[in-house]
UniProtKB/Swiss-Prot annotation:
Name of the coding gene: rplY
Assembly description: Part of the 50S ribosomal subunit; part of the 5S rRNA/L5/L18/L25 subcomplex. Contacts the 5S rRNA. Binds to the 5S rRNA independently of L5 and L18.
InterPro entries according to UniProt: Rbsml_bL25/Gln-tRNA_synth_N (IPR020056), Ribosomal_bL25/Gln-tRNA_synth (IPR011035), Ribosomal_bL25_b-dom (IPR020057), Ribosomal_bL25_C (IPR037121), Ribosomal_bL25_long (IPR001021), Ribosomal_L25_dom (IPR029751), Ribosomal_uL5_bac-type (IPR020930)
Entries under HAMAP family matching the protein: Ribosomal_bL25_CTC
Stated name of the protein: Large ribosomal subunit protein bL25
A GO biological process held by the record: translation
Length: 185
């Protein structure tokens, strides 16, 4: 996803309030854990993009930020919402630097749910864990990890270790945890 961002000067409440009134989202771009720049993202463009995303996919979406004539690859590290309107009011981006490890949550997508043996026998498929914490290089980031549930029967479970994790991605979460189960109704 490509976003054009503008620089902003200050962190004063009055300035940030004015940015939001003009249709912007105040944001901070971090690099190596340190603040690199205060920026503004167009609220309409970002909200439209959010509405097209699958649940949980924002954490592993790589953004290309056009900032002061250069292209910066970044991940959303934190997002804050308004309490009542649920509008995005602040973003934190983390710059992706080639060769430097990045920690992120990657969503788990169950595939072949319609053909699941346990569901055909009247069971209910329950996804216990929806994402897995991993460490990888920016070039190895994947939008999601797939877990095939086709052969899962009634009262059976699949663990995180059953996910086919691509080379270059190291899970931080314990792989012994149950990811999906088929329960009797």
């Amino acid at each position: 996803m490509e976003l054009v961002v503008q620089s902003r000067e200050t962190d004063k409440k009055s300035v940030i309030k004015k940015i939001r009134q003009q249709g912007g989202i105040p944001a901070v771009l971090y690099s190596g854990g340190k603040s690199l720049a205060n920026i503004v993202v167009d609220a309409r463009v970002f909200s439209k993009f959010l509405s097209t995303l699958e649940s949980g996919a924002l954490a592993s979406t790589v953004f290309t930020l056009s900032y002061e004539g250069r292209e910066i690859k970044a991940l959303v590290k934190d997002i804050q919402y308004h309490v009542t309107t649920y509008d995005v009011i602040h973003l934190d981006f983390e710059e992706l630097v080639d060769g430097r490890d990045v920690r992120l949550n990657v969503p788990i997508r169950c595939i072949n749910t319609v053909d699941c043996v346990g569901v055909k026998l009247g069971g209910s498929l329950r996804q216990v864990i929806r994402c897995i914490r991993v460490v990888c290089k920016p070039k190895d980031i994947v939008p999601f990890l797939e877990l095939d549930v086709q052969s899962l029967g009634l009262s059976q479970t699949l663990k995180l270790s059953d996910i086919c994790i691509p080379e270059g991605i190291r899970p931080v979460t314990s792989l012994k945890e149950v990811a999906v189960t088929v329960a009797r109704r």
